[in-house]
Design a protein with these regions (language model features):
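Periplasmic c-type cytochrome electron-transfer domains
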Residues: 1-251
């Protein structure tokens, strides 16, 4: 409902709509596998960790961790075990429990022992990794701009029919006077960074703190690159390691 294949896997709405209404626009998924940080504020540092966020969010999918684990065990056990090994024992665990649910779900989660919570979280993390594997397959098709640039890089005259005259004027403005390319550069037309562009908040009484609030979230995320459920080696987590450094020289 939020990720329409005809719209680069987003919905085209100002804010996302799930079981409730969100505060930001649904992100397009095509090409997301190349992103360093995920969500508009970068509160996730991998595609698989990002895939988990909406599942437990109260206004998106509104689910909880044990419910997803039970669903996988009931409906996709064979596929799960082919990819990730034996499914842990879930018999006797509450159907609805999780660290981010309502009071009843949180209480049920707290009543589970550490091993049970870790087992469920491992299944949940693997669910995100399976979703991310599919999402990484969604790639942009070569565009007319790609063909234009490839010709110039190869030293060939660009086909005059590839870009219209008004598009060529826009491209010159984008690269030149507009200086859009300062931030929008590279194959994906992004520098993968965060910028304060001076746009006023949608709601002045409740400003969106954006990246300022997200840094603490990604550092404390149990599913981050350095966490126990990550398959990444420490040297593959340079951005997060830099962010978490307490060296004054890096502040």
């Amino acid at each position: 409902s939020c990720h329409d294949p005809q719209r680069q896997f987003q919905d085209g709405l100002p804010v996302g709509r799930g079981v409730g209404t969100g505060t930001r626009r649904s992100m397009p998924i095509v090409g997301a596998g190349y992103s360093t940080w995920l969500f508009w504020d970068g509160r996730k540092d991998s595609l698989w960790a990002q895939a988990l966020g909406p599942l437990e969010d109260a206004v998106e999918h509104g689910g909880n961790r044990t419910r997803y684990a039970h669903l996988l065990a009931s409906n996709h056990r064979k596929e799960y075990e082919t990819l990730f090994g034996a499914m842990p024992r879930l018999e006797g665990l509450p159907r609805d429990a999780g660290p981010h649910g309502d009071a009843v779900e949180k209480a049920a989660w707290a009543a589970m022992d550490t091993r049970q919570r870790d087992d469920v979280s491992r299944v949940f993390a693997n669910m995100g990794k399976a979703i991310a594997a599919y999402e990484k397959s969604l790639q942009h098709e070569p565009s007319r701009l790609d063909r234009h640039v490839e010709a110039l890089v190869a030293g060939r005259a660009a086909d005059p029919g590839v870009l219209r005259p008004d598009e060529l004027r826009g491209l010159r403005l984008f690269i030149g006077k507009g200086q859009c390319v300062t931030c929008h550069n590279g194959p994906l037309l992004t520098d993968q960074q965060f910028h304060n562009t001076g746009v006023p908040p949608r709601d002045a009484a409740r400003p969106d703190r954006g990246r300022a609030a997200a840094t603490a979230k990604v550092r404390g995320d149990e599913f981050n690159c350095l966490g126990p459920f990550s398959d990444a080696r420490p040297e593959q987590c340079q951005e997060l390691r830099f962010m978490m450094s307490d060296d004054p020289a890096l502040e």
